[in-house]
């Protein structure tokens, strides 16, 4: 977790659509609570209908009594939620058909209505539509059912949307619940050997990856619970094209299991570098679930307010909505580097570079100590200035990997390129992406 730096905050997490979907995929306590809460929300809604729905009280009471008699789910009987909607519809079949016929009659009678009667009848049609839609608010959606049944989940998203936070937070939840889980950080894999071998080397295990999956399958079978494997940030593997060959092998092995699940994440623009053509199209892979992590896109205001409260920032919320605060990483960096003064992005970036210098030297202490450097030497700042000078000189908006390797900075400062670049990508000081014509 410490290696993720600002990409994971164990004590502070904001729920997103992606985190809800991941909960269903691994069948954790949050997913169980979400399903049971849907039933309670619907029961509360019945109490809010009031006198306007008096004519439909028989239908409402029948649905209420049926719901009350449906037991809450837990991990063992989770699949019962698959049947909640069908159970309700079966009990209400006669009454539902009667309501549908009543709605049809009302619609037919609208033809010869005056304005007042039309308004009243349209209100009744609206009430019937509300009642008929209620059964869809319990149990599981089709997508949630596919998440539960599928063994592989592919997550993509823009930089900083919270993919690492997503996996790390889920891993932390599993650990706190004494459940088995494996989180792998793809940025550790730095050579051209098979990725399965590199994974096992990083895990310090002297047997093959398939054997590790077999062990997890045995554990899951004994505990009767899923054991998820999360592989985060596939794009950060130094030779990330290796995943094209490795993923089909790994997915084939996972699909042979009953209790092991695999979830992977990467930046969207790397999709064609990482996935082979067969894996890219969801329509060709009904047994694989696909989601896009959009950060706080659907709850930006709630997230910003929570972040400002957490970091003690008192400025009015509206003042900050001009920034890209639907991106969790940017919001985190902003809050961590905010010092109570007037917002100033150049000043913010300077603070971020200073913080990156500290983190870089904490992550690679021997590299810097052996060369006599401290955080006050502003290594990150000097590297960024060197890159900017190259960009200005060459008239580009980016620097390619070959030119980055050839910068005079590396000889001048006597520092190794690969570990420093890897760390600066993790710090989001450098942003890499595949160049496409």
Spans of features found by a protein language model:
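C-terminal leucine-rich, beta-strand-based interaction scaffolds used for sensing/assembly
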Residues: 1-37, 43-65, 73-76, 157, ...
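N-terminal pre-Walker A segment at the start of P-loop NTPase domains
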Residues: 2-58, 64-67, 83-145
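P-loop NTPase Walker A phosphate-binding motif
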Residues: 153-179, 268-272, 276-280
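Post-nucleotide-binding-loop coupling segment downstream of the phosphate-binding loop, primarily
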Residues: 161-227
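Conserved P-loop NTPase "ATPase switch" module shared by AAA+ and STAND
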Residues: 218-244
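Conserved Walker B catalytic segment
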Residues: 234-263, 278, 415, 419
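Conserved small helical "lid"/interfacial subdomain of P-loop NTPases
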Residues: 270, 278-317, 353-361
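The conserved phosphate-sensing helix
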Residues: 321-336
